[in-house]
Curated annotation (Swiss-Prot):
It comes from Haemophilus ducreyi (strain 35000HP / ATCC 700724). The record marks T51, K109 as: Stabilizes the phosphoryl group. It is found in: Cytoplasm. This is D-glycero-beta-D-manno-heptose-1,7-bisphosphate 7-phosphatase. Transmembrane segments: none annotated. Mg(2+) binds at D9, D11, D134, K135. The active site is at D9 (nucleophile), D11 (proton donor). Zn(2+) binds at C91, H93, C105, C107. It catalyses: D-glycero-beta-D-manno-heptose 1,7-bisphosphate + H2O = D-glycero-beta-D-manno-heptose 1-phosphate + phosphate. GO terms for biological process: ADP-L-glycero-beta-D-manno-heptose biosynthetic process; carbohydrate metabolic process. Coiled coil: none annotated. Its EC number is 3.1.3.82. The record marks R108 as: Contributes to substrate recognition. Its cofactor is Mg(2+); Zn(2+).
């Protein structure tokens, strides 16, 4: 039997979305997120980041800059909360992007490629898992991958009627998910 997981969008879910966040100085965790992640991890859930990063394809920042920020974020969660991300998956592509990143891929949400790869790599049972994101695309990707519970949070993009309809739960923040998860 596979493991249970919480799939996590980054911008607008874990951190305040200032638009194409790629520098440590601009990265701010949403209040209470670190503690909530620790509680989810303590309940036996794998924590898996699944994030579109089209800023790479658009030339706003490099893949190396993204990786440096991600390493810092990962280190901060471990150092401050004892949280270890079990998987980090990102899509650097964008159909109107530049160079090698200009492509229509299977990993960019709303496609489910990142989820499918994580499910395979980490032996995740999507039927026991959650997706937490701030956009309809997050939920559509999760649904395609068979993730049971789709959670929309109000900490990022404005919630659309379509997104609200697709969500199993609409919460103010990732912090509010903890009581729903056993």
């Amino acid at each position: 039997m596979g493991k249970k997981a919480v799939f996590l969008d980054r911008d607008g879910t874990l951190n305040i979305d200032h638009g194409y966040v790629h520098q440590i100085d601009d990265f701010q965790f949403i209040e209470g997120v670190g503690k909530a992640l620790k509680q989810l991890q303590d309940k036996g859930y794998l924590l898996v980041l699944v994030t579109n990063q089209s800023g790479i394809a658009r030339g706003y920042f490099s893949e190396q800059q993204f990786q440096q920020l991600t390493e810092w974020m990962d280190w901060s969660l471990d150092e401050d909360y004892g949280v270890v991300l079990d998987g980090i998956y990102y899509c650097p592509h964008y159909p109107e992007g530049q160079g090698e990143y200009q492509q229509k891929c299977d990993c960019r949400k709303p496609k489910a490629g990142m989820f499918q790869q994580a499910i395979k790599d980490l032996n995740i049972d999507p039927a026991q898992s959650y997706m937490v994101g701030d956009k309809l695309e997050d939920l559509l990707a999760a649904e395609t991958a068979g993730v049971k519970t789709k959670v929309l949070v109000r900490t990022g993009k404005a919630i659309t009627a379509e997104g609200e309809k697709k969500a199993d739960l609409v919460l103010n923040s990732l912090v509010d998910l903890v009581p729903y998860v056993n």
